[in-house]
Structures are given as C-alpha cells and as structure tokens.
Amino acid sequence: MSFVTASGKTSAKHAPKPATWAYAEDFVAEPEAAAAARESAAPLGITSVGRGSAATLTFLARAVQARAVVEIGTGAGVSGLALFAGMRPDGILTSVDTEPAHQQAARKAFLSVGIPTQRFRLISGDALHVLPRLSDGAYDLVFVDGDPMEYPEYVEQGIRLLRHGGLIALDNALLGDRIADPGQNDEETESVRAALELVRDHDDLVTTLLPVGDGLLVAAKR
C-alpha cells in the first residue's frame, strides 16, 4: 500500500508490513463479550468492525466523554460494545439497523455484560428515515457502518446531529483497498469516495483517515 502526501508524492516506505499491521490491529485484547458477539455475527451474514477499529471506537468515546451516541448499522453488537466501553456510565446509545435479527443479537450482547436496557435504543428501520427525527447538535459521537451507498447522506445527517467538539467516524473508509485504486469506479466505491471528500473538505470538520481495520475516517466538529 502507498499513501499520498500533501505534496502529491507517495510515502510507500512508511507503509507497515503485513505482520506489523496485524500486530497493531490485535494490540488491544478483545473482551470476551465482543469475541462472542463477533462469533454470533457470522451466521447472520454480518461483517463486524475489526479489532483495531473497535479499540479505536472505545478510545474515541472515552476521549469525548460520550454521553449520547448514534450508531448507523447495529450489526451483532461488536461496535456497540466497543462504544459502551468508552462512554460515560450514564451514556445512551441509539443504534439503527434495518434487520431486527441483527438488533436481537446486539441486545443479547449488551445484556450479557450487564448494560441496562435504558442505556440503549435499538431502532429497526431505514437510517435515512430515522436520523432526521433526531435532535440537532445533541450527540457526542456518530458512528457510521451502514449501507455504503448511503454514506454521503449519513455524513450530512451526522454533522447536523453532532455538538461542537463531537466526533463522526466512518467504518469501511478504505473499502477493501478499492478507494485508493483509481481503476475502481463502481457505484458503491464512488459513494464512499464522495462521503470521504465531503468530510475532508467540510469547513466545520477536522479530519483524519486511520488505516485500522478496513479504514476508519474520523472527524471532529469545530
């Protein structure tokens, strides 16, 4: 893998070797509950966030002392557990997913570690219908792991939902190496590229792209 610097030159010499990347990805041990949730995801056809991404989500939630978090794409609860691990003890997670079976798995994962039901709202439905009903500037962190075709719309809604100083994080930001490949021009890839550019070029956001998991784009709202 090579990286493009501000000067337009690539910095391939700084790219980690596969063994180094794997070491970093697994550096933080995964809790048993998260490992169990990850295992339950496979039969449901869910691709959960990587270990490195999960550890980063915990770090981000702790860094902003998150009390109110929105998650787009519940999955089997792996990312939700990671967010809870960093949130304040009174924090509430609002998680949206189109698949009730996914949310049932996530609910089981949350309850398995003693998270009370009043700390999570699992909303079954289309995120583009749910998000507009949530309050402006009321959330500390928005995590996007939904349909890549809707990433630009998620970003627009996420920015609206964030308080000043809040964070938005987009998983699958490298999309299996497709984003960096100029030969990949399918609709899904172009949609994610558009979302990345929207975040990068937004005047109200400070942005970084982290090479953890399948890529995690993180931005703070000024």
PLM-predicted stretches and their roles:
Residues 1-141, 148-169, 173-222:
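A short alpha-helical cap/connector motif
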